[in-house]
A protein has these predicted regions:
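FNR/FR-type flavoprotein reductase catalytic core
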Residues: 2-8, 12-15, 40, 44-47, ...
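Short, hydrophobic transmembrane alpha-helix segments
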Residues: 19-34
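Transmembrane alpha-helix entry/boundary detector in multi-pass membrane proteins
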Residues: 33-36, 114
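Structured alpha-helical
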Residues: 50
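Juxtamembrane helix-capping/reentrant segments at transmembrane boundaries
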Residues: 66-70
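Ferredoxin-reductase
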Residues: 203-294, 310, 335-338, 346-348, ...
Length: 434
């Protein structure tokens, strides 16, 4: 689905409850009261839409890109939080105490029934906690699967609490039409969560894989290869990624996103370049051959297939080489006539992976800690290095594919924009958003 259509669909779904509230509501209230209700309605609708912006739905993420999907997910969560925080304060001057006999439409008052308000208060306290935890998760000592569990359960709990609060405490939510809409939207959102954590694992169970190779390719970096068990494998484009689960139940939360470093043209086996970092990856080299594995994917739009630019520029930092290596391998195996250049940055020489395979032609190695007699580039991947590597025509006509540390990508993207590289020729993948 194309980005403009996705944007229109998002706006339509989020504003649907607001529009219906205006159509089915009673006599208008004071502006600050209507604003309070409107912000609350928008906040709830946006929170429900967060479930389908999780990045696990290919119709969305594979067309607009995983980076755009997750950044939009984060941005909308923060805006929804802002709306939710403001919502109760705009009612401060509204008479309370519940409905009056002469005010059957609840035009003049708001409820003080604690049974109706308590769920809203609970959600009001949980929502900022969940958002702040997501923002700071990389700085907290949480295992990845623990954070995923907290995030998923927390989001589900907030949705259920807000549904009760909206239907029973809200002036508009109590209308039969609005109640039906909120029930349907909440049901679809919760259903999307069940699909990701129940239906997908069931489907994956019928398409198991097994580990065929675990090879060290550089300091603390490994290549893990898996082969399909009794099925044809995975259809994917070079540069995409999957959620990889090794040695666990399909329902386990111990799965991680890894870019595919092999090429589709190489056959059904799939390889991943994985760095020892923490949780599952710190023991990656100890995986035994034959261990069962499950793949959910492919995801992502970091692909140069079907593009028409005359050249491809691959810019990688560290383990960010993985998807770019898949692209390079595919181009070499298929005899792709397009020109290609690779810039590959690392801290030290022992971190350079696949050096023999990559070779020297049209490959620029960059080290921030260069040893004696180092012949390649030194320092970091920056503007001057890019200017030495690419011509003016290449900046404007080639497609640039980036993957690596956020700081490196920020520097490279800024310089490419300064050199008039069109945004549609700039593909990037971060896997880190805060």
């Amino acid at each position: 689905m194309k980005p403009p259509i996705l944007i229109i669909c998002y706006i339509a779904v989020v504003t649907l409850p607001l529009a219906l509230s205006w159509l089915v509501g009673g006599p208008p209230r004071a502006f600050h009261q209507e604003l309070a209700s409107g912000l609350g309605i928008l906040a709830f609708a946006m929170i429900l839409m967060e479930f389908v912006l999780s990045g696990r739905f290919k119709t969305i993420s594979n067309d607009i890109g995983m980076d755009v999907t997750m950044r939009f997910h984060q941005m909308m969560a923060r805006i929804a939080l802002g709306f939710a925080v403001l919502h109760p304060f705009l009612y401060l001057s509204t008479p309370s105490g519940g409905q009056r006999p002469w005010d059957t439409t609840r035009q003049l008052t708001i409820t003080t029934d604690i049974s109706d308000l308590s769920t809203g208060i609970a959600a009001y306290l949980l929502l900022p906690s969940l958002v702040l935890l997501a923002i700071g998760r990389t700085k907290l000592d949480f295992k990845y699967e623990t954070w995923r569990l907290i995030h998923g359960v927390g989001a589900l709990l907030i949705a259920v609490l807000l549904l009760h609060h909206t239907v029973y405490a809200g002036r508009y939510g109590s209308q039969p039409v609005m109640t039906a809409v909120w029930l349907a939207m909440t049901g679809l959102s919760v259903g999307s969560l069940c699909y990701v954590y129940l239906v997908v694992p069931l489907l994956d169970k019928a398409r198991a894989w097994h580990v065929t190779s675990v090879v060290r390719v550089a300091s603390k970096q490994w290549e893990v290869t898996v082969a399909p068990d009794g099925h044809s494998g995975l259809i994917y484009d070079a540069g995409q990624f999957v959620w990889l689960n090794v040695g666990n139940s399909t329902f386990s939360l111990r799965e991680n996103p890894f870019s595919i470093s092999s090429a589709p043209a190489a056959g059904p086996e799939i390889s991943f370049m994985i760095k020892e970092y923490g949780d599952f990856t710190q023991n990656i080299g100890q995986i035994k051959l034959g261990t069962v594995a499950y793949l959910d994917g492919p995801y992502g739009s970091l692909s140069v297939e079907r593009r028409t630019e005359p050249g491809v520029a691959l810019i990688a930092g560290g383990v960010g080489l993985a998807p770019l290596l898949g692209i390079l391998r595919q181009m070499r195996l298929t005899g792709d006539p397009r020109k290609v250049k690779l810039i590959y940055g690392n801290r030290s020489v022992d971190q350079i992976a696949y050096r023999d395979e990559l070779g020297l032609e049209d490959v620029t190695y960059v080290l921030s800690e260069q040893p004696e007699a180092w012949q390649g580039e030194t320092g970091f991947i920056d503007g001057p290095l890019l200017d030495r590597t690419f011509s003016r025509e290449e900046f404007t006509e080639w497609v640039f594919v980036l993957c690596g540390p956020p700081l490196m990508m920020d520097v490279v993207e800024d310089h490419l924009i300064m050199r008039d590289t069109p945004s549609h020729r700039l593909l990037s993948e971060r896997f880190s958003y805060d």
